[in-house]
Amino acid sequence: MSCRFFTTAVQTKTGISMLLIERGEGMETKTIKTSYSSSAGTCLIILEDVKVPVGNLLGAEGQGFLVIMYNFNHERWYICAAVISATRKVLEECYKWTNQRTVFGKKLIEQPVIRAKLAHMTSQLEGVYNWLENITYQMTQMDYKTQSVKLAGPIALLKLMSTRVAHLVSDEACQIFGGRAITKTGMGRYIEAMQRTYKFAAILGGSEEIMADLGIRMASKGFPEARL
């Protein structure tokens, strides 16, 4: 773990505050192994009698939760972009494999059941990809405060659908590749990696259940009162 600075939510007298803590005396980090890799730098941070300068306060004291919330939209958008990109790579590998692999004297792509799988995978992926493009454009037309109000719900629902589609594509790719899908080398390596890591996106930045609830709560919040 090589980070020098850590943005940390801490309990202060007036509530949760965000501090920028520099590595130094009283701080210890221990690596936590994950199913992905060590590149994320996941670790346990131990703070003991650490002194932080007043100037390292991010935002107002006691308003740390707002700082966290303001960053959520962009974080979730990034997760959507990343998981959709990874899913597209897996689908691309499926197209390559089905046009190359021969079974019972025919290429896999000539089997109706395989084409049906690819059709379902492709249509689902293109749907969330275009939704991402739409939201990305809207983000460029709004300031950060407006985004937090107008796009929090749509981004949450996009994240929910993006990870659901990743689950579908990953699972179907495993069926298409067969035994190669559980090997870490050769043409199956991308499929194996996706099987092992796609749940990261479904958890980080808020789980699928929380995204679903947030999306509907935000939609209901702006919905006019019913009139009979």
Residue ranges and their predicted role:
Residues 26, 36-38, 61-63, 187-194:
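Short, surface-exposed loop/turn microsegments at beta-strand edges and helix-strand junctions
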Residues 46, 70-228:
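Alpha-helical interface subdomain recognition
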Residues 49-67:
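Long, acidic (Asp/Glu-rich), low-complexity accessory segments flanking structured domains
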Residues 4, 41, 156:
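Exposed loop/turn and edge beta-strand positions of beta-sandwich/beta-sheet ligand-binding modules
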Residues 22-53:
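Flexible, small-/acidic-enriched active-site or ligand-binding loops
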Residues 1-28:
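A short core secondary-structure module
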Residues 11, 35-38, 203:
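A general structural signal for short secondary-structure junctions and capping/turn motifs
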Residues 15, 33, 42, 171, ...:
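A generic hydrophobic-helix recognition signal that picks specific residues
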